[in-house]
Regions:
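Hydrophobic packing within well-folded, soluble alpha/beta domains
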Residues: 48, 52-56, 69, 87, ...
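Conserved Nudix-box catalytic region and its N-terminal flanking loop in Nudix hydrolases
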Residues: 19-58
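Active-site-adjacent beta-strand/loop module that shapes the phosphate/pyrophosphate-binding cleft
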Residues: 63, 72-96, 103-105
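Nudix hydrolase/Nudix homology domain
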Residues: 32, 80, 97-132
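Short secondary-structure junctions
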Residues: 59-66
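Conserved N-terminal beta-strand and adjoining loop/helix that marks the start
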Residues: 1-20, 41
Length: 132
C-alpha cells in the first residue's frame, strides 16, 4: 500500500473587533464553497510565514504581518494528509479584494457554527472556541 503524501498548509487567524476573517472556496476548487481561514499550501523551500504572506497577497491582495503559530492539526483526507498550521496575523493594509476566493466574511465566535468548514479548518475552529 502506498503511503499518502503529507501536504503542508498554513492559515491566517486575522481578528478585528472580535470578528475573524474567513474565506469561501471557489465552486471549481476541491471541497467547493466550504469556508476556511485564509491561507494555502507551503511551496518547497518556503517558510510557513513566507507562504502566508504570499498566499494572502495572491488570493485577496492583503498585506499581513505574521505573528505566532497558535494551532497545528493533521487531518486525513481521501488522497493525502493535511498538516495545517495556523498563525495569528495582523492586517497591515486593510483593503480586501477577493481575487482567488469566492467570498469572505468577518464572523464572531458565535457565528462559526453557521458556516461549513473542511475537516482541518473545523478542527482549528474547535480549538479556537475551546481557547486551546
Amino acid at each position: 500500500m502506498v503511503a499518502k503524501p503529507i501536504v503542508r498548509v498554513v492559515a491566517a487567524l486575522v481578528e478585528q473587533n472580535a470578528r475573524f476573517l474567513i474565506t469561501q472556496r471557489r465552486p471549481e476548487a476541491t471541497l467547493p464553497l466550504l469556508w476556511e481561514f485564509p491561507g494555502g499550501r507551503v511551496e518547497h523551500g518556503e517558510s510557513d510565514k513566507d507562504a502566508l504572506v504570499r498566499e494572502l497577497s495572491e488570493e485577496m491582495e492583503i498585506e499581513i504581518e505574521v505573528g505566532d503559530k497558535i494551532f497545528e492539526v493533521t487531518r486525513e483526507y481521501e488522497r493525502y494528509f493535511i498538516e495545517l498550521a495556523t498563525y495569528t496575523c495582523r492586517l497591515v493594509r486593510p483593503h480586501i479584494r477577493p481575487i482567488k476566493v469566492h467570498d469572505y466574511r468577518w464572523v464572531s465566535r458565535e457565528e462559526f457554527a453557521e458556516y461549513e468548514f473542511p475537516g482541518a479548518d473545523q478542527d482549528t475552529v474547535d480549538k479556537l472556541l475551546k481557547g486551546k
